[in-house]
Amino acid sequence: MITTQKTARLPKRAQVMRWMAAAMLPIAVVACSTEELLKANYPDQIEPAGLSTSLQGASALYAGAIGDFTVAFSGSAAGGFGQVMTTGYMTDEFAFGGTPPEIRQFDLRSVDASNGIGASTYNGLHSAREAAVRAAGVFKAIAPTDPRGGEMKALEAMLIVLMGENYCSGAPISTTTPTLTYGPSLTTVQALTLAVSTADAALALAGANAQVKSLAAVTKARAQLDLGQHAAAAATVAAVPTSFVYYVKHGTATERQKSITFTQGYNSHSFLVSNKEGINGLDFATAKDPRLPVDGSGAPSDFDVVTPMYFFAKYNSQDHAVVVSSGVEARLIEAEAALNASNPALWLSKLTEARVPYSMAAPADPGTAAERVDLMFRERAFAMFATAHRLGDLRRLVRQYGRDPAKVWPTGAYHKNGLTRGTDQNMAVPATEKNNPNFTACINRGA
């Protein structure tokens, strides 16, 4: 409420004194530096130097790194497909119900090195890694006991795991901290070994924070599993509770925060759950598995008028969460270690533990070694659907279990346009990486 009040008339002497005080104001102004007068103070903003010297700056870097990781991992409606979508298309998880050829290349498993979506996805992964590196370094320098430093290191490790799992052997890792240094090409084994040591650094920085310790442990074990170190991987996650979940979350405040998987799925009808894709694909859309809720009747997409419309119901809003790492994954890692140790009883026990959060009955032992491997990877596929695990798992089926690629990957005739699927088993490093003088080409495009 605004009120008005009349001003009383001042005595003559008081009027004179007020006039003298007012007359002195210009003198005071002249006595001040004009630079100081024009320098605005914004207490809610951080000067660039403060990013690396204050806890407030470290917190800002942390928030930025989480945002960059979310975009690199799960994409953004503002642009950037992320690892979830690109690997989902390349495997049997998702079918493309649209028409743009650059996206279709992923679903065909025939991605050109000049593909713009491939380049932005790859660049996003490395930008997020560098953001995590910088934030972790600042926390280590000014607040070494803050568990967020360990969290940043764990996310750095996760991004290296994703590079090792999803890209060809020979992808380099460069750094911009403190200055730009071009990295050499790394084999898949070298990249995953680096991920293990980075996760170890995260564990050392986690302190007593159970959430960060579990994130770092599952990330390390995932890399160990990729390296074929099954027993070591199981030991790494032994203390991780099944209830553990680490996730990132989209939002609605800005376009960058919004979910591209929702936009391309429920809105555009192009990012669609697959069903027995390319002969070898699993029955994701029709299995009625509680771990993989599906919307849609299977009617043709409104976009291409061909692809059956099934939507992943966990990603049914612009602000959904995406699981990055979990205790369920820890139990599945232990199960696979037991399978490789020829201990089917323990294997089934661990599979059952991984089903508990979904109130599912224990699985039956199929009996043969090959069928047990099939069940192991089916359990992983449904429990970790659309979380950027499947491409690495299909590669492991070929690399570690000796499966024929033609019997693992979606193959044969494409479901539209009269096209035939390609033979890519990973994503190529984009042509833009040739700016790096240490990189020439992928070393190996196999599993």
Which residue ranges define each predicted feature?
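Long, repeat-rich segments with strong aromatic
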Residues: 308-346
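Short acidic-aromatic linear motifs embedded in glycine-rich loops, typified by GG[WY][YF]DAGD(H)
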Residues: 33-151, 158-162, 166, 170-192, ...
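Sec-dependent bacterial lipoprotein signal peptides
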Residues: 2-30
